[in-house]
């Protein structure tokens, strides 16, 4: 009698045979290893924060075994609701255990013992490190003065409450001062410009988008630059759902903030946002779409009426835009089109949308001000 064996029955038989082997005495050593691995190990969760040169300082819940972080959890407390969202860390925070557990991480003071660039260091005690730093600091202050000490702020943990730049600043001020700096590589120009334009650097919250009909973003890309616990991208989307606002993204690159969520993307030549803003103002002025009572009440130097008495004639903003100022150049859409590479008809359309939307949410990112004359772009 000849039995026929199908491919399926052969696979079933092989699987059963493998299962029998897996449960036989051959696996006893491995079974012991499994039981040993399952032995109770003390585990705890501690709260920390993410300090990676970012101001969000997101909450992190670190799960620790054998004094080693093996899992990082973000904020899971409370109810994640609009207006009171959870502070969820981005990928930098969620992967921070790789930074903490990295073999090249400096855990102790290291003193150079060779020439610069040789990479020769030896471990020293904290007491020796503090004595070395304080002795050299006293020597430099005595021999060269306080201006010989410059404190940098890009430390990698500058965003922390305890680890931020104010701590060494306070220390050096207590010693008589130090060589400081103006601004920062992040926001130097926009910080200076906004203080002159608005008196402060504070703006309104993204949740104000819920009250608008139009959102215009000049070089603002929160999906890639504000993806941390501030939750700006998520906030923007939630607010837009409430207002159904039209969103226009102005950026040289089709960025992640747009990514199909935008209603219109206007690619612009880098660093020319200021010219676009001037052309928008030209349309608003010439088509009588400005809020004149608001300008008269809150603005200085918009036109001749609010120009300071000692200012030259036609030195006001309106004259500059219309070409009646010292440069004699009218900031028309055609003028801006040659600079920005945005067609004049698109500029006119954008200006009319801004002028007719009541209210509109207009914001700018930090990218446009990181160019020469960036403070003028911000203004």
Give, region by region, the residue ranges found by the protein language model.
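Short, hydrophobic/aliphatic alpha-helical segments
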Residues: 37-41, 74-79, 324-329, 355, ...
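Glycine-centered helix-coil hinge/cap
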Residues: 144-145, 176, 197-201, 313-325, ...
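N-terminal export/assembly segments and adjacent metallocofactor-ligating motifs
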Residues: 1-289
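Long, well-ordered, tryptophan-enriched scaffold segments
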Residues: 242, 253-357
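Acidic catalytic cores of enzymes that act on phosphate-bearing nucleotides/polynucleotides
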Residues: 355-379
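Conserved short loop/turn motifs at secondary-structure junctions
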Residues: 152-160, 335-339, 365-372
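Short coil/turn segments at secondary-structure boundaries
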Residues: 144-154, 183-186, 292-298, 349-351, ...
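A generic alpha-helix surface/boundary motif
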Residues: 165-166, 330-331, 379
